[in-house]
Each structure stands twice: as structure tokens, then as C-alpha cells.
A protein has these predicted regions:
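Positively charged, small/polar-rich N-terminal and surface patches that mediate targeting and assembly
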Residues: 2-112
Length: 112
């Protein structure tokens, strides 16, 4: 078992203690592939809040229908900032809800 000192593993693995990973599930406005304008808007909104993140294209399902989905991974301890940008993205795309997963728990973030 290793102890972390100053954010580094004193056991010699060179790994940091890490950050929470937040995962967003963002469906496309019309269910089809994301248009370049919508994708650019998502990237710009995320970039204005976080130095780094990862986006994967996926096919999700909502109410039994396939929906082009962006899965976004953000490593940060600032959950309120993630929730705020999630709502901003959802409103920009005209979504009712955007999915947020944290610590293995999924919740739908409402735009209300």
C-alpha cells in the first residue's frame, strides 16, 4: 500500500492521486450526427471552463430511439462548474436533459 505525498505516490509508481472524472452524455438536438456548429459550440463551452477534456462519439438511446451522443470526460474536482456548463450546453442545444455520471452514479441534469 502506498502513501501519497504532495500529490505523488511515495511508493515509487510516479502516479498522482488523481481527480474526479465527470462524464457527460450529450444527445444531438435532432438525434442525427452532430453538425459542425453544434459540436463546435460544445467544444467552445467546455474549453472556456476546463483546460482539458475528452470527447467520444457514441450512439445512445432515449425513449427507445437511437440518438447520436457525445460522451465527454472531464477530470476536475469542481462539480458545480461541471453542472453549470452541462446546463449551458443543454440549453444551447435545446435539450430537456443532459446525463451526468460521477463516481459511478448517473443523474439527468434538467435544463429547468
Amino acid at each position: 500500500m502506498s502513501d501519497y505525498v504532495d500529490g505523488r505516490d511515495s511508493g515509487g509508481t510516479g502516479m498522482s492521486a488523481g481527480s474526479l472524472v465527470h462524464t457527460l452524455y450529450i444527445g444531438s438536438p435532432d438525434g442525427n450526427s452532430f453538425g459542425s456548429a453544434d459540436r463546435t459550440a460544445v467544444v467552445e463551452m467546455l474549453s472556456s471552463c476546463f483546460a482539458g477534456f475528452t470527447i467520444n462519439d457514441a450512439e445512445g438511446f432515449f425513449e427507445g430511439r437511437p440518438v447520436a451522443t457525445l460522451i465527454v470526460k472531464i477530470a476536475t474536482g469542481d462539480t458545480p462548474a461541471v453542472e453549470e456548463v452541462t446546463r449551458s450546453i443543454g440549453r444551447k442545444l435545446g435539450q430537456r436533459k443532459v446525463g451526468l455520471e460521477l463516481k459511478g452514479l448517473y443523474q439527468s441534469i434538467s435544463m429547468d
